[in-house]
Swiss-Prot record:
Residues 53-90 are annotated as: Disordered. This is Antitoxin VapB35. Antitoxin component of a type II toxin-antitoxin (TA) system. Upon expression in M.smegmatis neutralizes the effect of cognate toxin VapC35. It comes from Mycobacterium tuberculosis (strain ATCC 25618 / H37Rv). InterPro entries: phD-YefM_TA_antitoxins, YefM-like_sf.
Length: 90
């Protein structure tokens, strides 16, 4: 972690905040003593998992697709539709 004096922070605020944006943690000092810390804001725990590569962000927007449930009787949808259509005709 790097240290920045309050005086430097007042004079170069945008530069210090740019460093924080890049992920750097800054210790603020007053007369050589650390009095505060500026750390990058995190949107949540998911961001850290994405940055480490543990998870990947979704590629499709919207709700997640529901898992398919096997039909009773072992029929596929095509066979079931054929039977339903045949029953409607008579």
């Amino acid at each position: 972690m790097n240290e920045v004096s309050i005086r430097t922070l007042n004079q170069e605020t945008s530069k210090v905040l740019a460093r924080v944006k890049r992920g750097e943690e800054i210790n603020l000092t007053e007369r050589g003593k650390v009095i505060a810390r500026i750390i990058p804001a995190s949107a949540g725990p998911l961001d850290s998992l994405i940055s480490t590569g543990s998870v990947q962000p979704a590629r499709v927007h919207g709700p997640a697709p529901r898992p398919t449930i096997p039909m009773r009787g072992g029929l596929d949808s095509g066979t079931l539709l054929e039977r339903m259509r045949a029953e409607e005709r008579y």
